């Protein structure tokens, strides 16, 4: 266990990985004189080899510590081009709601979606479900990193939109934020969005306990395949405009099957293990 903790602590930061990629003799796509100017706030232009080094470094770091959201975000950006993020953008352009989102470019934060308002909505509404999930998991919409490594400004917004809508996907499916829940959701997202990072995240299943891994592949992966292949493109959901909609009705419209409650399953397993220990102690005494 101490070795694992040391490896997790050694996981590089995004800044360190980016600096390493720029300093490598194989990554000099741009010199200090010809590096393009940023195309939008926070944009960091990188060459092909620089993105390759950044992809490898962030992938290794995220595998060592699956809770490093910054590394996962970086991996998502540098592996989304040249094809996948454009495919997602084109899916939005082909949909009326998607086109409206691209025109409006809304952002999901605690200012644009105040939690007190969301908590005041009807109990089974989308907004109330989202707020309840945020409260239960102890997370905030303000923690999402800004996109940096996608060159096209419109595609950068598409990635930002996907990133900020991720918690809505959690809320609608009911999946929690611990690693097992994140992997189940990532498998669903991969089949819905085709963003490579979501599929690559499944490598983190090696970090699960055997029982968790067996449950992921036997119960939640089949759910992810069914819902991911049959559901509509979630990137085209204008969440801000359907906050009062019934969440069960939304799931039916989108073609999303609600998975078994992961927290309830884990709670029942813990209770069963506790009873078994108590029975063993009773026999031994």
Curated annotation (Swiss-Prot):
SUBUNIT field: Component of a multi-subunit COQ enzyme complex, composed of at least coq3, coq4, coq5, coq6, coq7 and coq9.
UniProt EC number: 4.1.1.130
Membrane topology: Peripheral membrane protein
Keywords attached to this entry: Lyase, Membrane, Metal-binding, Mitochondrion, Mitochondrion inner membrane, Transit peptide, Ubiquinone biosynthesis, Zinc
Pathway(s) served: Cofactor biosynthesis; ubiquinone biosynthesis
Cited InterPro entries: Coq4, Coq4_euk
Originating species: Emericella nidulans (strain FGSC A4 / ATCC 38163 / CBS 112.46 / NRRL 194 / M139) (Aspergillus nidulans)
Catalytic activity: a 4-hydroxy-3-methoxy-5-(all-trans-polyprenyl)benzoate + H(+) = a 2-methoxy-6-(all-trans-polyprenyl)phenol + CO2
Transit peptide, residues from-to: 1-37
One of the record's GO cellular component terms: mitochondrion
Coiled coil: none
Subcellular location: Mitochondrion inner membrane
GO biological process: one example: ubiquinone biosynthetic process
Function: Lyase that catalyzes the C1-decarboxylation of 4-hydroxy-3-methoxy-5-(all-trans-polyprenyl)benzoic acid into 2-methoxy-6-(all-trans-polyprenyl)phenol during ubiquinone biosynthesis.
Homology family: Belongs to the COQ4 family.
Stated name of the protein: Ubiquinone biosynthesis protein coq4, mitochondrial
């Amino acid at each position: 266990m101490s070795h694992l903790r040391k490896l997790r602590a050694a996981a590089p930061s995004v800044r360190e990985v980016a600096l390493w990629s720029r300093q490598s003799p194989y990554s000099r796509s741009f010199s200090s004189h010809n590096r393009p100017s940023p195309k939008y706030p926070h944009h960091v232009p990188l060459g092909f080899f620089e993105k390759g080094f950044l992809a490898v470094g962030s992938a290794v770091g995220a595998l060592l510590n699956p809770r490093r959201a910054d590394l996962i975000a970086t991996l998502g950006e540098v592996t989304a081009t040249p094809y996948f993020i454009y495919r997602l953008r084109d899916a939005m352009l082909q949909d009326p709601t998607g086109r409206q989102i691209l025109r409006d470019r809304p952002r999901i934060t605690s200012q644009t979606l105040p939690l007190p308002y969301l908590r005041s909505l009807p109990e089974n509404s989308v907004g109330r479900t989202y707020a309840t999930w945020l409260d239960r998991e102890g997370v905030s919409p303000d923690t999402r990193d800004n996109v940096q490594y996608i060159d096209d400004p419109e595609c950068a917004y598409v990635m930002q939109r996907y990133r900020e809508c991720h918690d809505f996907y959690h809320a609608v499916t009911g999946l929690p934020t611990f690693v097992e829940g994140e992997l189940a959701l990532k498998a669903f997202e991969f089949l819905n969005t085709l963003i490579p990072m979501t599929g690559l995240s499944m490598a983190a299943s090696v970090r699960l306990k055997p029982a968790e891994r067996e449950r992921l592949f036997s119960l939640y992966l089949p759910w992810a395949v069914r819902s991911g292949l049959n559901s509509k493109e979630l990137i085209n959901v204008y969440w801000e405009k359907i906050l009062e909609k019934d969440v069960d009705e939304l799931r039916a419209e989108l073609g999303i099957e609600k998975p078994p409650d992961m927290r309830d399953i884990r709670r029942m397993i813990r209770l069963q293990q506790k009873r078994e220990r108590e029975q063993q102690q009773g026999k031994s005494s």
